[in-house]
Amino acid sequence: MKTVSEDLYQKARGLMPGGVSSPVRAIAPYPFYTARGSGAVLTTIDGTDLIDCCLAYGPLILGHAFPAVQEAIAEQLQDGWLYGTPSLHEVRLAEQVIRDHPSIEMVRFVSSGSEATMAAIRLARGYTGKSDIVKVEGGFHGAHDAVLVKAGSGATTLGVPDSAGVLPDLVRHTLQVPYNDPEALEMLLSKHSDVAALIIEPVMGNIGPILPEENYLREVRSITTAHDVLLIFDEVITGYRLGIGGAQVCYGVTPDLTTLGKIIGGGLPIGAFGGRAEIMKLIAPAGPVYQAGTFNGNPLSMTAGTATLAWLSAHQEIYHHLDDETRAIEEAVIDSPAGAHGSFVRLGSLFKLFFRSSPPRDYIEAKQSDTTAFKEFWDQTLQSGIFLPPSQFETNFLSTAHTEQQIEAISAAYRSCRYE
């Protein structure tokens, strides 16, 4: 007998490419459809409750339908949800973001992380007058042409890290280096004088997580400064995920520009980019670098974001608690069959089991993971009532909503997995 989800997917395949609105959701043989989310639980349209370790791929650090955010949204709805004019709400969120990031003196809000990285790259080119950018192999910075080159996340999952339709003349301006390899960066910048910026996930969240080796980010900062290249930290995942101020505060490295998204919108669509005032003042209408958007700074996203960041700022102890919870999962996995088949990587509330003998240090090593073993593992954890991102190349997340009992259930699901 077919499930409701199976019926919906069959219908959706005739209405939308692949039956979904984003590729990673096309889970074989068919995805489950969600009816509601509450706390750390998703309830499918077929009535199954799943402990959620995907959390919409990162935004929901407070879990689903968090009361303070829900109340803020409900209150704002009474006053409207889109004005097309400035509002108090964007000023408040800007103040919060700037206060939390010493590197950010001015900020522009957009509607997605992809828009944020696209605009930050344009701004870097406008500020420096240079044409090329450098990205890290396997780094994912959204689905726009300049960065769909050896891209991680769903692009690697589907085997299309270099997308069709991206013009070769554009791609030649996107240079690449391996992660955790400062010598390769130094060599590349020594040979190319027309580089405007390096864009990098300080912690590779869209292929892992893959963690920076000791002093790597400091060396990156030193090398880019020496070659007069702007450093853009893509903190769409790590912003407010690792703590107030993100990876740049965690690792003590100051970028020139920062991109944010996910958590800063409290679960509603948002993106942002910011940095030194002298750079940001080139953005229109203050300067000649154009960026605009109908939904930029919309009051609903601003309100949800402000409520989320205010709660996080007032409860910073949760970051230590989340770190303890991923440690508990790691300790449970170590002596299990799953642990014997892979390497557990974690940082704060980010975690992943890579099906390879050691934690990957770059994109090439991550791609050497056994994706067949991962699929077998993923199927078993789903049957145990745990929803993990359905790709070896996506990060798992925890939220403040996960209870001790749910952490134990996640650990038990990992321990119970068996392999042929």
Swiss-Prot record:
Gene3D superfamilies: Aspartate Aminotransferase, domain 1, Type I PLP-dependent aspartate aminotransferase-like (Major domain). Pathway: Porphyrin-containing compound metabolism; protoporphyrin-IX biosynthesis; 5-aminolevulinate from L-glutamyl-tRNA(Glu): step 2/2. It comes from the Archaea. One of its GO terms (molecular function) is transaminase activity. Its EC number is 5.4.3.8. The modification N6-(pyridoxal phosphate)lysine is found at residue 262. InterPro entries: 4pyrrol_synth_GluAld_NH2Trfase (IPR004639), Aminotrans_3 (IPR005814), Aminotrans_3_PPA_site (IPR049704), PyrdxlP-dep_Trfase (IPR015424), PyrdxlP-dep_Trfase_major (IPR015421), PyrdxlP-dep_Trfase_small (IPR015422). GO terms for cellular component: cytoplasm. Keywords: Cytoplasm, Isomerase, Porphyrin biosynthesis, Pyridoxal phosphate. GO terms for biological process: protoporphyrinogen IX biosynthetic process. It catalyses: (S)-4-amino-5-oxopentanoate = 5-aminolevulinate. Its cofactor is pyridoxal 5'-phosphate. Pfam families: Aminotran_3. It is found in: Cytoplasm. Belongs to the class-III pyridoxal-phosphate-dependent aminotransferase family. HemL subfamily. This is Glutamate-1-semialdehyde 2,1-aminomutase. It comes from Methanosphaerula palustris (strain ATCC BAA-1556 / DSM 19958 / E1-9c). The gene is hemL.
